[in-house]
Amino acid sequence: MKNKGFKRLTSAAIVLALILSVFPSVFAADQTEFATREYVVSEFVQSVGRNNLTGSDYILSTFSDSDQIDEEYVGDISKAATAGIVRGYEDKTLRPKENVQRIEAMVMLARCLENTDDIQPVQDPIVFADVPDWAVDDINKLSAAGLVEGYGDGTMGAEDSITVEQVKLLTDRSDAALNTVEPGESFYGYVNNKAFRNADLSSSTTIDAKHGAIITQENAWSHFTDIYNDVTEKENDLLVQLVEGDLEYEQGSAAQRIYDMLMCIDGKFEDNPDDTELFESYRSMITEADTIDEFVEAVNNIYKETGINLLFSISAVQNSETGKMEPGIAFASMGSGGIISYSSSATEQYGEEYKNLIKEYLDILGYPASDSEIEKAYEIQETTSTGMELIYVVQYVYGLMTRSIIDPDFDEETSDAILESLIEEHPELNALEEQTTATAAPQEIYSIEEANAIIDNIDIGSMLSDVGFYNIESVVPSLTGNLEACEDVLTESNLEALKINALLQYGLSIKAGSTQEELDKLNELVNLNSAVVTGLDPDRYAELYAAFMEQQVQDASDTAEETDETETIDPDTERILSAENMQELQNLMPMDIGYLYCEYYYDESTTAVIQQMVDDIKAAYIERFKNNDWMADETKQNAINKVNKIRSTIGYSKEQLFPDIIPVSEGGTYFTNTLRIKQNDLRSVIAQCGDEDYIYDIMLMSPDIQNAYYNPSLNNICILAGILNAPIYDKDASYAANLGAIGAVIAHEIGHAFDANGAQYDENGVLNNWWTEEDAAIFQEKQQEFVDYYSRFEVIDGVTQDSLVTITENMADVAGIQCVFDIIGDDREAQKEALESFATMWAQIGTSNYLTSEQLLQDVHSSNQVRVNACVTTIDAFYEIYDIQEGDPMYVSPEDRLKLW
């Protein structure tokens, strides 16, 4: 069969390479790099696969010189020693730094392969004159499998020292023999077979390499999780150094802000009469309001002085008619009443408990309320949550994801049951998938006068101008139907209920200043909200989450201890970096740890490299549009204009606004610095609405996250520093390899400008139909082609993904990878590098249950093996490089290969 022929051809080529490699070493012996025992053992263990072996620290410790092993090799040598691959010398030493004879290396390789069924004989064993009797069986096995050919003179150079180059050739051949997936069967599985064998999993597994599925356990792995773990480890180490005074930093840096805020958080319960008086004064403004006008005035004054709006959620939203950023406005949800009432089962299970918690909190404040007023406050919370239905669904999904992380007993049946119950109660959720391709609904925009006319007893224009918004002529409702539903909320009859909700909102918005008793009750309220979306009992959720956070802190301590085993973490450091303190820091300053990472680990030269790649990809898109054979000239020019106007922010934003955090030594406190943070949040929203460039220069998420995104309403892309790590971006890799990975990501994000959703926005990010009627009709047909094309690829045998849900991501994937190959041109080696780096980037292992779960199958992204295999089948070079023939599962006839632009 053709597939076997491909494997034999590959093996023969590698064998030939080994034979030929002997001669250069004869003439350049002084340049030969010989391999040490620790290097050889580690390479062989990785070739066979770490997941096939189990290590034991105890067994390794029985060798007297185990402490001489380099840290990077310890884990692999532990596994090799436990499996008997390396057995040491009679004097109980391993001699890890010594060079290794070829015969010794070959025997270790044979031992690695003892429990592997994938190494099969392809020829008769070769008889070598210099192989000792004790090694004959092992060498016969290797030579029969075509892994050892010797020097061609009847010897194998048994006593010669093995070189690094020869070790690499042996591992390459072993990898080829162990790779049970052919490129014509699953390119994703073919490229990532070795990665799957070496993924960092906790126990031995059975892996379906074709799909990247674990059959026997629930661990998961991907390069993205590896990068996340590496970034997190670096951040934890920085935090320990920072707190212990071992990190130098400048005033105004993320390190300075984090350090001084942590010191304030750590001393949050220190007595400060001035802070207490100020904190209570804002609370008194609420409780002492006797009329609705006084209440609104109090809310506005608090907003002006603290940046906290107790009635409204104010954000920056684009005006779809003008492209300008305007204040987005909706009533604040004021608590958990909305999400509890969204689910009848949650209402039944948590409704009364929630109201009782509010009552208990008010009693602690010394502001008792009747049951009827609390009931009215709850009803107002329901009303003010109008328009948040989709947000609640997202919260449920993220809640269940959180549960899967913190709850060892989590099972997917529980998750599916919760989501199915929601869908049954809210059938409109079934239509969500159609929103990925539906025409965006026209946006409602209100003049200030129109907004004031909807809601009684509030002057929205004055409220905004008083805090610094200027030249505001209109506002954008950020939640559909929200303002209209709340038109009668601000009435005298609701005054007490509004004050209850405002007190609750105040406590939740600024915990600084609250007593421990107040905080404990607020935490119960927060845990109840989390219980709703995770399906856990509130106490159980609190217990699991606390344990998870403590483990994160312990990981930080372990990282620091590993840096120098003679040092221990200072008890004060452990206290300052406690789970509670770190959670509060993250809540208050969600971007600062990401900026801390960038300050110490982001290579500034990367920005220019990635920007050049962005420019190259934009040029490739423009050429595609110029040469497009189905778009009218007018539509082509509109598309080209849009590409030219795409802006990019790379790594992190240098324009992001941050608060001045005042050190404790200069009078800074937990409360006053928290107010500075809240005021800065407001300042950022004002800047987004008032400075036309600012919104394009900032990022909407922390730069350490492994992500990139396109914003259709801004027509810009952001490539975050967290994703600019190997193997997604490797500064030492070739341009072609990086194009296949981070280049494909960039091209994907630009592709979103022209997917089923992004294509509805023009070059200014305005919702505007720039298509001719005929072109729009063809574009719709193209979308159906994507649905049909992706339906042929399986997530796992017998299971396909809903390609209607994933259509926008699939369109961006295909358009992106095809632009990448336009840039590469006809260079076969570069094409091969790009294809394999693309597949490598998306390597992921998940359980077969996870891969086929309803949650994943409804993800807007195709599962990783589908997005790789579907994309590469659209590239003609793929078929030529890997000899993909008709009849192979990966084969698609030329006329059926997907093409968008």
Give the positions of each predicted feature.
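Stable alpha-helical elements in mature extracytoplasmic
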Residues: 36-44, 72-76, 102-109, 134-138, ...
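Active-site-surrounding "flap" and adjacent substrate/cofactor-binding loops of secreted or lumenal enzymes
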Residues: 182-186, 190-265
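Second-shell loop/turn segments in exported
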Residues: 30-31, 62-67, 93-96, 126-129, ...
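Short, glycine/acidic-rich hinge or "gate" loops at secondary-structure transitions
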Residues: 205, 254-257, 367-379, 394-398, ...
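Feature responds to low-complexity, polar/acidic, surface-exposed segments characteristic
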Residues: 2-9, 14-75, 83-103, 111-137, ...
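Sec-exported extracytoplasmic/periplasmic mature domains
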Residues: 45-53, 81-85, 110-118, 144-147, ...
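Noncatalytic, helix-rich "gating/capping" subdomain that lines the substrate-entry/channel surface
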Residues: 229-608
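Intrinsically disordered, low-complexity linker/terminal regions across diverse proteins
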Residues: 587-590, 594-901
